[in-house]
Structures are given as C-alpha cells and as structure tokens.
Amino acid sequence: MSSDIIMAGLGRPFTLGFLYDARREKLIPGFSLFGDETLQKYATSTPQHSSDFQIVASDSVESKSNVMDIEASLGVSFLGGLVEVGGSAKYLNNTKKYQNQSRVTLQYKVTTTFKQFKAPPGKVNVQQTAISDKNVATHVVTAILFGANAFFVFDSDKVEDSNLQDIQGKMEAVIKKIPSVSIEGSGSVQLTDEEKSLASNLSCKFHGDFLLESLPTTFEEAVMTYQKLPELVGEEASDGVPMKVWLVPLTRFYSKADLLVRDISQGLVRKVHSILEDLHKLKRRANDSLEDDTVKLFPLLEKKLKNFQKNYSDYMTTFRRTISQKLQSIRKGDEDETAMLQLFEDRLRSPFNIDSLNMWMEITEREINVLRSCIDIIEETKHKAVLSQSQMVKDLLDSEVMHAVCYVFTYVTDKDHYLDALRDYLKSPNSRPARVRPVVTWVASNTVLETMREKAHLFRSLAKDMENRCVHFLVASIVNLKVEGAAIHYYRESVLIEPNFKHPIISAVEKIVDRRDLLWYDCELTLDPNTSHPSLYLSEGNKKAVTGTLRAFDNNPERFGLWQQVLCNKGLSRRHYWEVEWNGYVIVGVTYSSIGRKNIDIQSFIGFSETSWTLMFIPKNGVAVKGARRSVSYYFISDLAFPPLGLYHDCHASTLSFYKVSDNVLNHFHTIEIKPKLSEPVYAIIRIGDEDRPYHGTVRLL
C-alpha cells in the first residue's frame, strides 16, 4: 500500500534524505539515505515566499488540524500520542480549560524556501548500513517546504453561558483588527471604548517558530509582536522550519525495505476525532465546576470532582495508548480496522461510555446549582462558611461565641458508587460486567430542594440584620443522610441544644433567670457624642461616661443643653438586651429620639417626661422605676454594691424589663408596660448626676 506522503512538519527536524517510519510516525534522525556528494548533486533550493493570516474561532481538534494542514492519518497519530510536536505545533496541545470560555486564535504563516531531491530512482547509490535491518523505516524525505507559523491564542475569562456567543463575536471583531496595523510598528489598533475594555481582559498564549525576546501575554503585547514577525523571517531555509514534508516509499530506492501495508479510513479518523472531542468537552465541564466558588465551600464535593478528573485522566492515558497500539498494528498489517472499532465498542460497554460520563456531570452540575441556590439566599446575611467539622468545632469553642446558629448541608459527600466503578474498571478492565450508570441522587428530588430552600430562608430571617456579638451564624456541611438535605442547628456555648432550630423560645420576662437566654438579643451600644451634655465626659470608645466640669460646647441641635443626658447610637425596634455598670446618681432607660434637647420643661427630663421609661438609682435611697403616666415604683436595696444592671426591651410587646445580673444568673425586679404601644424605634438614654445638686456618677456600657 506504500505510496507518497505529504505531511505537516509539526516542529520535527526533517532533512532531505532522512528516513521515516510511517507506521510509528517516527523520524529516524542522524542518518541520510543519500551521501553528502549525492545530495549536493541532486538537491535544489527554490525561493517560495508567501505570507498569510487567518482568524480561528473554533478550538476543536478538527479545526486545528485544518489550520496546520495536518492530513487525517497524521492527525489520528497525534491524538494517539505517536507524534511529539514542537515549535508552533504545540498549539495543538493548547485546549480551552473551561467550557464557558471564549477563545479566538490569530494565525500568521510565512513560507521561504522549497528544497527537494530530484534524482530519479536507480540513478543514485544509497547507503544501506542503517536500512539493512528489518522494520526500521518505510519512507524517505525527498522535499521540504520551509517557513514559520505563529499562533496567538486569546482567551476570555469564564463567562455566563448566556453571554458566551456574544463575547465570542466581539472577540473575533477585535482580533481581526490586529493584521490591519502598520507593519512598521508605529501603528496601533483602533478600538472603541467597549472593545478596549474587552481587549484588556484577554489573556494571550503564543506558539510560534519565531525566536522572540519575550512572549506576549496581553492583547497589547500581541499587537507589538505581530508587527515584528516579518522582520524575524529571512529568505533562506535556515531562517525557517520544515512546514510541509514530502516522503516517498523507501522501496523506490531499496527494494527490501518495509512497507506501510495499510492506513486507516476517513470514517475511522472522524470517529476518533468525535470521541476525543467529546472527552475534551467533558474535561472542560469538570474544570468549570472545580473553579466554581460554590464548590470551594464544600471540600467533599471538591474532592469528588478531583477524583473524577483523576479517573478521567488515567483513562485518557490508557485510551490514547491503546489507539496508538492499534494504529501501528493496522499499518503493519497485523490487524484491520475492526480492531479499532472493537476498541470503541468495548468503551461503550464500560463505565467510561460517554453517556454515563455526561450523566454524572449533569447530576454533579445540578448538585452545584442546588447548593448555590441555597447559598445565594443566605449570602446577604452576616455568616461564616466553615470548610470542615473541625473548623466548626473550633469556631464554636471561641470564648466570644455564646450562641451559634448553623445552616448544615447534610447530603454533600465524596462517596459515589459510579466513581468507585470507574476506579475499579481502571484497575481491572476485564473484571467488570456491563456498563455502569451513575445513580440519580437527591438532587433530582424537588421535595429535598424545597426543604433546603425553606431552611435557607429561615436561616436568613434569623441572621439578617442581626448585629449581636454573642450570636454567630455559620454555614457548614456535615454528612447526615438521616436528615433531608439541610438542617439548622442551634448551639449554646458549643453544645448542640436543638438540631432542628426554628426560632428562639423566650420565657415570660419575670421568669427569665438564665442570662444566656437574653444574650441572644444582646445589643452592643455606644454613647452618641453629638448628643452628650457638655459636663459629661465620654471615654473607652464612647462606652463610658462620667460627670465633670461644664465645658464650652458647640450649637449642635442634637446636643442636650440643660440636663446631663446622652443618647445611645442606635434605634431599638425589635428585642434588645444590654447591660450597664453604674455608680452614683444615674438614670437609665429608653425614650423617643424626639425628646427635647434645649427645653427647660419637664418633657426633656428623662424619668419625668411622658415619652421616657426609666430606672433611677440614688445612692443611700434605692431605685425608682418610672413607667406610664409618670407613675413611679420604688425599690429599696440594702446592698449598695449594686451588680450590673440588665435591660431587656421588647418592642413588639412594648415592655422594658430590669434585672440584677450576677454571672449568668438574672434577678428580675420590674417590668414597665409601655402604653400606648410604641409607635417608633426608641433609643437607650442615660442621665448622670445633677448640676444643680452635688450629685455625680459614672456609667459604663458593657
């Protein structure tokens, strides 16, 4: 079957007279069939100058083969791993990493010289020392076209699937402008603002037969490099590389040489291309998934994808090696094409059949989408994602964490029967029975999805706008197949209290004795210096106030000008708990923000105004609590070393409760029922001392 062959050089060091084994796609270097004298006599060299460029929008094996003038049989040899490419031909190995990524390639091609050996067979003596042994070579190089190729491969970042086609079209339009730039190097590509923005985000990979001082990595550098390429190519063959090679059967010069018995058909070539292209797409999909931000939150899911990629990579190595072996056997005549077809049939019956592989990816992609939908619901809340159970335990044991609410994904695991089948098949390809399909998991259950999303919404409602230093919100993945999809765990001081938490349960205010129950509503307050009376001195980050000498002050309309009072920084509109330490003459409570600032009348004096609800502490006298309609309740406390005071405000119930605090024990002594019910947020307020009487005091917010 041996006949003339025309093939692409692909960066291989072809020379006139070199031997070539077309069965193994192997160049036999270091020996020429013809001696130097014969080559000088019959070799000719002819200038053949040309240059061209083209834009390549496809990343398929077939399109790359067409661009590089690779004939079908050589293309399959490359895919089977028989051909090691160099120079610009390394472009063949550069495939897109992600499926959702746009790629456009600019090719620049020049030819310089055509060399050929023109002696007719029978007119020359050949050197037989290296070809006397059988199975060395089938062909000899008789002509070479020299030149150079350059490929600028531009990639976009990962994009949404819906934007892929639009980005692709815009990239093509931008890159088509590069060849229009002046070759002298003084020109620049004329781009619109939108095109400039697009070009600035493109990466560039260069594959070429040109010796560059530095390789371009950006669009601008690619433009500059493209301008210089014509200067880097001379007119002699020594300035180029073998672009195209002509080979004739060795039998024309040596009758005992081996033959290329047969080659594979075009139909089989297309079959190989199709199979490998499908597998490349699968790899890109897996890469897309591994780069997904959602996957990075789930180490077990990430591990599962990496296991899949490893199995895939090991299979591809084995599959390509087998293709290589079958190709050589067919070309030697030891087998026919049915051997290759049988390889493909065996693959269809294996766990690595493309339908099962794609099905597994679809299931995994759906799992990622389900997890992302829950994460998106939670995302706007203040939470911390913990990547492992050990990290979760560490966070729960943090001394600052009194309460913790954790949204737990229960079904995310690295266990997968299909991946086990892939691994077992690679170990013993003949021991596994019929093809194995992935198991459709929980991701197909709408019920599970609804449960997970409902719990995500509940978690968000608990965590949204929560500004509580004692309550931490976590998101974790803990395998528990007994719980459908997700659960909300409630921990108190690192101990799991409720595995199916919905909302905190609060006792009647007078029955609350455990301080930790109210710390769920802890509210970290600071004093507002813009409202502070000039005789109050704030310190410790506006957490402490003491009475002192009256100072000069500005005319800020928010500042109290008569009574020694100061408001806290935030409005209270839900349930809130805070604590204070006090000493001396002090009044604490809540009021509307509209309380008078400069008025002399009683309505600007907390403890006596109708829109303030307070507790007054007077040393040696005790405590007075003022509620609705200026009614006052008196509590006389013998222990003057009053412990910290706890205040619990329930806006919905319209109450303000007071507790003596001792460690984690609360002693309730009064609750004000605010009537009429509150109509707007209230603010914590403090009065210290009295400038008209020798009353002084100190307050610290805890």
From Swiss-Prot:
It is found in: Secreted. GO terms for cellular component: extracellular region. It comes from the Eukaryota. Expressed by the venom gland. Keywords: Cytolysis, Disulfide bond, Glycoprotein, Hemolysis, Hemostasis impairing toxin, Myotoxin, Neurotoxin, Platelet aggregation activating toxin, Secreted, Toxin. PROSITE patterns: B302_SPRY. GO terms for molecular function: toxin activity. The keyword Secreted applies. Residues 2-265 are annotated as: Structural MACPF/CDC pore-forming domain. Its main location: secreted. GO terms for biological process: killing of cells of another organism. Intrachain disulfide bonds may be present in the heterodimer. Signal peptide: none annotated. This heterodimer induces potent hemolytic activities (when tested on rabbit erythrocytes, EC(50)=25-56 ng/mL) due to its ability to form pores in the cell membrane. The pore may be composed of 10 alpha/beta heterodimers. The toxin shows cardiovascular effects that include a vasorelaxant action that may involve the L-arginine-nitric oxid synthase pathway. In addition, it displays edema-inducing activities, increases vascular permeability. It also shows myotoxic activities and interferes irreversibly with neuromuscular function. This is Cytolytic toxin-alpha.
